[in-house]
A protein has these predicted regions:
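Membrane-embedded alpha-helical bundles of multi-pass transporters/translocases
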Residues: 3-246
Length: 247
């Protein structure tokens, strides 16, 4: 081609790394789909809470989101560990997600109404504004930390979308029937929440250990053509995450 040299981008990931990374959206959507679609049904029909009060508590809880987005983005940016910057937050953050998700669906029916509202608000706020935020921001950051290849980043996003769509579809389709199968009532909701938490822990762990973050030296290396604009920028990640839909 008359001296024209085609430079091919260096590849960093195998197909199973990309698939494994994508399974992290199974974990994220086990939380998101289950909570957003069924928490109000559980709280009003099983626990007997007022939907208006619950809605107000959820709205108040979301006020913390913007602050925690910035906080965890900054924390990830300054993290140095053997696992890298983002993977520790993604890994440990989901254990918090699992505990608090179970807590939301395990409100003791023996408590008074005020205590039940307080239980829900605390568990929901910790889940949404703390643990889910930490896990989700770290998960999003990984695409810039494990590869500098733009095509691989697009492919990682495609696997995320596939697993996200599939998980949402399954959760929406089977949850009500599963609750009825376990007898309905508070015990059934706790059982389903526990099952989803285990699924989330397994798939999140798989996603975390399916990829390895590049070293700081590799991330700063501009030898790959066209990568100058793709350097890791947590400020950009934070801005994107602030605009994302929370639980």
């Amino acid at each position: 081609m008359k001296g024209e040299i085609l430079m091919e981008e260096k590849t960093y990931l195998k197909w199973y790394n990309k698939v494994g990374y994508g399974t992290g959206d199974i974990a994220g959507n086990v939380v998101y789909a289950f909570l957003s679609s069924f928490v109000m049904i559980y709280l009003t029909n099983t626990v007997g809470l007022n939907s208006g009060i619950v809605g107000t508590l959820i709205a108040v809880s979301k006020l913390f989101d913007g602050v925690t987005d910035i906080f965890f983005g900054t924390m990830i940016d300054h993290t140095k560990s053997k696992m890298g910057k983002a993977r520790p937050w993604m890994f440990y953050g989901f254990f918090g997600c699992a505990i608090t998700l179970f807590g939301v669906f395990a409100i003791p029916t023996s408590l008074g109404k005020t205590a039940q509202y307080a239980w829900f608000f605390i568990a929901y706020t910790l889940l949404n504004a703390v643990f889910y935020t930490a896990n989700n921001i770290a998960y999003a950051a990984l695409t810039s930390l494990v590869t500098k290849n733009s095509k691989e980043r697009v492919q990682m996003g495609s696997f995320r979308f596939m697993f996200s769509f599939g998980t949402n579809l399954v959760i929406q389709s089977v949850t009500v029937g599963a609750v009825e199968m376990f007898g309905g009532g508070a015990t059934a909701w706790r059982t389903i929440a526990f099952i989803y938490c285990i699924i989330g822990i397994i798939t999140n762990t798989l996603a975390v250990f399916s990829v390895k973050e590049l070293s700081d030296e590799e991330l700063k290396d501009d030898s790959v053509a066209g990568e100058e604009d793709d350097k890791l920028s947590f400020k950009k990640i934070i801005k994107l995450q602030i605009g994302r839909a929370h639980v």
